[in-house]
């Protein structure tokens, strides 16, 4: 106890600022206590430090493994995405080619349909023209015939008198009578 109180008393009597010196008193500098503390720390701390380093090493290795797995997964997904992209590009090219083919086919169908429609319209036009020509010809014939008949009737009426008219009627009646006899036989 005396040593403890002496150490506190000696703390109160520090020499005032004087020079720098090396203390050779082994008990005052406490190297034994320091070496014991350092020895205990090294002995017990070695295992703790080793465990800490091993845990840290395992975490780093796990992180590296996880990173590698994630990298491999990302590479695999990238390859799948590239394959899908190639497939979609091929399908797009196919649709484009088919679309152009379909457009060309539709274009040809439309041209053919339009040509057929124009041909039908031309036929209808020609039939209508022919019909109108025939109708005009028939109308002209009827007029000519009507005018000829009117002219003939006018001529006959001007030439016929009552006596000639009676003789014509008698001749026609005689002709009908002989036709009737021929039929009955």
UniProtKB/Swiss-Prot annotation:
Q: Which CDD domains match?
A: ATP-synt_Fo_b (cd06503)
Cellular-component GO terms for this entry: chloroplast thylakoid membrane; proton-transporting ATP synthase complex
Subunit comment for this entry? F-type ATPases have 2 components, F(1) - the catalytic core - and F(0) - the membrane proton channel. F(1) has five subunits: alpha(3), beta(3), gamma(1), delta(1), epsilon(1). F(0) has four main subunits: a(1), b(1), b'(1) and c(10-14). The alpha and beta chains form an alternating ring which encloses part of the gamma chain. F(1) is attached to F(0) by a central stalk formed by the gamma and epsilon chains, while a peripheral stalk is formed by the delta, b and b' chains.
Kindly give the membrane topology term recorded for this protein.
Single-pass membrane protein
Which residue ranges does UniProt annotate as crossing the membrane? 27-49
* Swiss-Prot/TrEMBL keywords: ATP synthesis, CF(0), Chloroplast, Hydrogen ion transport, Ion transport, Membrane, Plastid, Thylakoid, Transmembrane, Transmembrane helix, Transport
Indicate whether Ion transport appears among the record's keywords: yes
What's the protein here called?
Answer: ATP synthase subunit b, chloroplastic
Q: What else is known?
A: In plastids the F-type ATPase is also known as CF(1)CF(0).
**Taxonomic source organism:** Vitis vinifera
InterPro entries referenced in this protein's UniProt entry, alphabetically? ATP_synth_b/b'su_bac/chlpt
Q: Which domain of life is it from?
A: Eukaryota
Task: Give the subcellular location.
Answer: Plastid, Chloroplast thylakoid membrane
Q: What does this protein do?
A: F(1)F(0) ATP synthase produces ATP from ADP in the presence of a proton or sodium gradient. F-type ATPases consist of two structural domains, F(1) containing the extramembraneous catalytic core and F(0) containing the membrane proton channel, linked together by a central stalk and a peripheral stalk. During catalysis, ATP synthesis in the catalytic domain of F(1) is coupled via a rotary mechanism of the central stalk subunits to proton translocation.
GO MF terms, alphabetically ordered: proton-transporting ATP synthase activity, rotational mechanism
Query: Which Pfam families does its entry note?
Result: ATP-synt_B (PF00430)
